[in-house]
């Protein structure tokens, strides 16, 4: 009696939860993903609305997306690699800036929050807060943005006082955080649908 076996299809890069399936990839592939992630973060930093003392950028969107796409461990590593590039002077921060001075200035608290944001979004993704549950995906990104504003605001308060920190470093970014969280969740849903279409072919 003969048996026929259909060839197993290799898993795609994008999973049905809208995340990248990097765990089973080679070390070289994951290292390349980290490099691409830092480029994505640098590009997002260039999308800027100048404000004083903290500019509006797409950094938090990119950070949350890296956490959601890469997962907690690799996502956090990617953010740390990007911040390392900034520390040695590469022009990867808002407005093409770089250097250690930015970690001690008004934006220091926000920069410090980015690895924690990626860790939070990635950890929640691994617990089902992903594209298959869009509202939870949105909530995870919103929580990460709130964490960023809290850490950034606390740092800024130490430099310019609590009232000014809230007025200049927190309040102007609340609506943007909500919108970027919605955009992030929608992007994950779109990637999830793309993966399903690929599986159907």
Residue ranges and their predicted role:
Residues 48-120:
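Alpha-helical membrane segments and adjacent membrane-interface helices in multi-pass membrane proteins
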Residues 45-48, 52, 89, 94-97, ...:
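Short helix-capping/hinge motifs at transmembrane helix termini and TM-loop junctions
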Residues 128-201:
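Membrane-embedded alpha-helical hairpins and interfacial helices in multi-pass inner-membrane proteins
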Residues 3-22, 29, 43, 100-148:
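Short helix-perturbing small/polar motifs within transmembrane alpha-helices
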Residues 31-35, 61-65, 75-81, 107-112, ...:
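Hydrophobic alpha-helical transmembrane segments
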Residues 2-76:
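Hydrophobic transmembrane alpha-helices
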Residues 1-35, 168-201:
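Alpha-helical transmembrane segments and their cytosolic interface
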Residues 35, 39, 43, 65, ...:
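Generic alpha-helical transmembrane segments of integral inner-membrane proteins
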């Amino acid at each position: 009696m003969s048996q026929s076996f259909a060839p197993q299809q290799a898993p795609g890069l994008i999973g049905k939860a809208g995340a990248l399936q990097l765990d089973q990839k080679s070390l070289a592939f994951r290292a390349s993903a980290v490099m691409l992630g830092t480029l994505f973060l640098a590009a997002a930093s260039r999308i800027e609305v100048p404000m004083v003392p903290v500019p509006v950028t797409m950094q938090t969107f990119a950070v949350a997306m890296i956490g959601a796409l890469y997962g907690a461990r690799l996502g956090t590593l990617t953010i740390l690699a990007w911040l390392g590039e900034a520390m040695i002077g590469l022009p990867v921060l808002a407005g093409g800036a770089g250097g250690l001075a930015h970690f001690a200035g008004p934006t220091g608290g926000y920069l410090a929050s980015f690895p924690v944001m990626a860790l939070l979004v990635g950890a929640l993704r691994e617990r089902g807060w992903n594209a298959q549950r869009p509202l939870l995906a949105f909530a995870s990104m919103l929580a990460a943005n709130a964490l960023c504003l809290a850490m950034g605001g606390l740092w800024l308060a130490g430099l310019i006082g609590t009232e000014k920190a809230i007025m200049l470093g927190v309040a102007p970014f609340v609506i943007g955080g909500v919108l970027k969280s919605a955009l992030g969740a929608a992007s994950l849903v779109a990637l999830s649908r793309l993966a399903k279409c690929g599986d159907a072919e």
